[in-house]
């Protein structure tokens, strides 16, 4: 895969709308510019080639807690059995604040290898060997953010109460 050039101004990129795309070149540029502006890595590397693996997913913290209390019971035969009551909290940070401990991924429905630009015209002598690009629409919309919240059980807090009886 080739490294992507992050355009700084409209003249840095040749915009060619895809077949059936009713947006003007200027409207496509505004979509591209807005996308670049919202992403910290792309924003600070305008006018440069992006480094390999330069853009990374946001870091996520997750803290899991376990509380356990043992209660000892003497049986009539003199044995000491144990009842353990426990409380497990997965993703405790998300319990404290709904924005903490949330995993993020590229927008759903898009390729894991995220591409916000699509080549619409291959380099040739007719276009001075300069490829044409567009920002593709999906279901009538363009992506507006690099990452979105990954809605799954791993991004939400969970609590479990347990009772265990142990024979000795």
Set out the residue ranges of the language-model regions:
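Short, solvent-exposed micro-motifs at the edges of structured domains
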Residues: 1-168
């Amino acid at each position: 895969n080739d490294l992507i050039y992050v355009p700084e101004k409209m003249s840095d990129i040749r915009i060619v709308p895809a077949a059936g795309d009713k947006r003007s070149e200027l409207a496509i540029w505004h979509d591209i510019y807005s996308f670049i502006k919202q992403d910290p890595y792309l924003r600070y590397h305008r006018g440069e080639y992006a480094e390999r693996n330069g853009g990374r997913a946001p870091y996520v913290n997750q803290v899991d807690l376990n509380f356990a209390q043992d209660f000892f019971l003497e049986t009539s035969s003199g044995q000491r059995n144990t009842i353990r009551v426990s409380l497990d909290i997965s993703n405790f940070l998300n319990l404290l604040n709904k924005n903490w401990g949330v995993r993020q991924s590229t927008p759903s429905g898009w390729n894991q290898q995220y591409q916000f630009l699509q080549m619409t015209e291959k380099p040739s002598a007719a276009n001075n060997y300069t490829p044409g690009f567009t920002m593709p629409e999906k279901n009538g919309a363009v992506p507006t953010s690099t990452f979105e919240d990954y809605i799954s059980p791993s991004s939400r807090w969970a609590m479990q109460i347990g009772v265990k009886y142990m024979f000795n």
